[in-house]
């Protein structure tokens, strides 16, 4: 069960690895101890809800040493808002996320975490990932399970932005009910992404590596 394990001193967390990170970093193996840089964002419960619907973790929060960033607000206006890189921690599990000031003392993380930095293959992008990540936010854990997660996505109205019956923002989102899971003995060399129709910006199917990461609770 994700969030707990047979050993009550440990917990299992779902981690999503996309095609880009699988190219940048050495693929994980079951039973291997890894040191990873992980991230979470406020869209994770919606984006990765199918990965492990039951996974929720309350994390204590501290401010990262990384500088303040700016983003476009969710109401669709063009006035940028500040966000503070922050670190969530649950036992030995840590992850980075962007917090709206003031930085909260706790957050409820759900959906899944994402791999941002791992053991680099040859390449400047992989090494740069650790430069961009807060070194004090890394997590060391054991890989307990590997699965291939295949999801369909399409351009759909974005609930984060205002819209009407004939206008509004559309963003690429996962199609509910399209998910497929396959148990893996080892990680694939690459992950697929392919168009399902000839329509421009039409539906696509994309593969992800889903890792059960065990850490001390």
Regions found by a protein language model. Give the residues of each.
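Short, surface-exposed secondary-structure edge patches
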Residues: 19-28
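Short, Lys/Arg- and Gly-enriched loop/turn segments at beta-strand edges
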Residues: 40-55
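Long protein-protein interaction modules used by eukaryotic assembly/scaffold proteins
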Residues: 53-217
